[in-house]
Amino acid sequence: MKNLSKDFGVEINNFDCSKEINNDEVEFLRNTMQNKHFICFKNQNLDGNNLAQFTKNFGDLETYPEKDKTKGKLEIFNVSNVSEDGEHLSPNDQRVILQKNNSRWHTDSSYRYYPSIFSILYGQETLPEEAKGGQTEFSNMLLAYEDLPDDKKILLEPLHQVHSYNDIRR
């Protein structure tokens, strides 16, 4: 296991997410997520079935009624500019528009009554590291808050934030 930064994220090598994992491994991964908030597993070869099976180790999965879910897998939300039949989607396609909105800062499923504990992303096809675009970034909002000066925390204490699914569709 390699730290990706001092306080946030680890890379775990030689771990096959397509294989069944035991309770000790589940507990180790759950604890690592809770302490480091982000795990990167490189060089995975997953299909919809074993991706869903791996994620079910951590709890019930959300389902997605939207038309851009992965074919036959209600629990896998497909983020792509390519349709199921391999055609590039038009810039005016509703799925492309929604994904452009997701390119802004957001927290997955924060608008749900019971928000997700984890989000698991699997890149089937990604750009080379030197390419522009396609970079997903992660942040540790707990650490960001802890690092605030006390006067800022006092200012934020009485405030409430609303995360709305409808707002991202504007």
Each predicted region: which residue ranges?
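Non-heme Fe(II) oxygenase catalytic core, chiefly the N-lobe of the double-stranded beta-helix
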Residues: M1-R170
